[in-house]
UniProtKB/Swiss-Prot annotation:
Tagged with keyword DNA damage: yes
Alphabetic keyword roster: Cytoplasm, DNA damage, DNA recombination, DNA repair, DNA-binding, Endonuclease, Hydrolase, Magnesium, Metal-binding, Nuclease
Gene3D superfamilies: Ribonuclease H-like superfamily/Ribonuclease H
Cofactor: Mg(2+)
Residues annotated as binding Mg(2+) 1: 7, 142
Residues involved in Mg(2+) 2 binding: 68
The protein's name in its UniProt record: Crossover junction endodeoxyribonuclease RuvC
Xref: Pfam families: RuvC
GO cellular component, one term: Holliday junction resolvase complex
Location of the active site: 7, 68, 142
Gene: ruvC
Predominant place of localization: cytoplasm
Stored InterPro entries: RNaseH-like_sf, RNaseH_sf, X-over_junc_endoDNase_RuvC
Length: 165
């Protein structure tokens, strides 16, 4: 099963594609960041996120997607921007007929690290450890968070399938 994880953001949208086999192994196939820095119009940023994710989705036979839920913070403007980026990401995935699953950042962190309030560095460390990614391989926080979302879905799917047996 191939899963794409998405960490939406208006400036930086992280993505990570993992493959999970029946033998319980998971491997990272690819990851990256869609940057909209230098683009001033919000509509153009959203379009770039949409088109760039479509491009990534065309490279792999993705079975399911996992995306971080939006949390509402004290700054309404940044919350709205995050909602827009999430919508552009969701539409990209849904337009390919791929089921998308949503997890809160707390649920993702708890699943990956055991601590729902874990700092980004701890999430990144556990992502690297879980997938055997060497320290010299560059993965930024946006990609790491997206990979964590994908791993969270893999682990939750395994638990659901185990419970059904």
């Amino acid at each position: 099963m191939m899963i794409i994880g998405i960490d939406p953001g208006l400036e930086f949208t992280g993505w990570g594609v993992v493959s999970s086999t029946n033998s319980q192994s998971v491997c990272l196939l690819d990851s990256g960041v869609i940057s909209t820095r230098g683009i001033s119009r919000e509509s153009e940023k959203l379009y770039k996120i949409y088109v760039s994710l479509l491009s990534v989705l065309s490279l792999y036979k993705i079975d399911e997607a996992s995306i971080e839920k939006v949390f509402i913070n004290s700054n309404p403007r940044s919350s709205m921007s995050l909602c827009y980026a999430r919508a552009a990401s969701t539409i990209s995935v849904m337009s390919r007929g791929i089921d998308i699953y949503e997890y809160s950042s707390t649920a993702i962190k708890k699943c990956i690290t055991g601590n729902g309030m874990a700092p980004k560095e701890q999430v990144s460390f556990m992502v690297r450890s879980s997938l055997g990614i060497k320290q010299d391989v560059e993965i930024n926080n946006h990609s790491s968070d997206a990979i964590a979302a994908a791993l969270c879905h893999v682990y939750n799917t395994r638990n659901r399938n185990f419970a059904l047996k």
